[in-house]
Every structure is written in C-alpha cells, then in structure tokens.
C-alpha cells in the first residue's frame, strides 16, 4: 500500500520559497525550502530536445521578458535566457540533485500534448530518484498514463472548476490525492486533499482545517 503521509509532513511551498529577491522555481528558492524543511511544489515542461525544466508558464515573457513559448526551445537555447537577467531556468535533474531526498517534492506536469513523450522522459529521471515525490496534473491523460505505466507512483489530480469535479468522479480510483482550489474547500472525497494557493495569514486560518495540507506562498 502506498504511503502518502509525507504530503502532510509540513506545509508545501508553492514554486519554492521565493520573494522579491529570489524568483519562483529557481535553485535558490529550492535551497531555501531544503533549509526550512518545507515540501517543494514545482512545475515542469519538456523541451524540444526532451530536457525537462522547472518553470510555471508556457510563455517565458512574464519572468524573462522574452516572448517565446518554452516548449519550442532546446535546453541550450533556454539556458541563455535568464529570469531577472540573473537566474538560469533549472532542469528537473538539477533540482532533484540539490534536494536529494531531504524534503518531498510535489511535481506538477504541464503536459497538453497527450502523446506520452513527456511522461516517458520524466520516469527516466524519477525511477532512479530515492527521495519522496508525488505527481499532479490538471490533464486526465497524465493520470491515465501513470495509472497504466507506473501504478506505484503517487498521483494526484488538480481540481479548479466544476468540470474538474466531474472528472474527479471518473478518476477517483486512479488517483491517490487531489489538489483543490481553496474556494472549493471543503471537498468531500475519500482521498488526501491539498488546498491551493494560500497567500495570506487570514486564508491560512480559514482553510487549514478544511483539507489535509495547504500549498502556500508569501506566508512561509
């Protein structure tokens, strides 16, 4: 039986411990999580050369000023583009190397292609990782793929509207947990429930007893 209690071991840092000086989803943000013992939540994309990198948006413009879609680049191309003209967008391998099992990692897969290449490349990395991790996605295709090919992995579905609620009912037997938008809490389901994203102390007090754990930023 899967042990998913690590998802409740501490609060979850949304895209790492970032602030005005340290951007989200960067190595310094993840180093801080390791130091403070927070669970890391991060986002991943696959590039044209099958490198897997840690970044939230599909377009780079917001954090880098470069108006390019991240999935259209190779890693050598992406590595020349900096966040705040200073920080390199890290690969998942780099992040896992510095974390090295010291804290759990919650990985959101940003896959909209539904062709399985992303998942196949990802498990080449995760199969050899000794630390605790879980996978989550808004895309039901991702849930299906992992249920078929890696049933031992801990898998969650991200819920953000009524459409996803209907999907949950269809996929409840295939998932180990759900990540629910805070305004949909409490969410009645016989699974571990994470709430996202908590950005104020008042929200923390309001939602902390309505789910099993919270994904937070600004308040950690």
Segments predicted by a language model, with ranges:
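Phosphate-group recognition and catalysis centered on beta-loop-alpha active-site segments
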Residues: 1-220
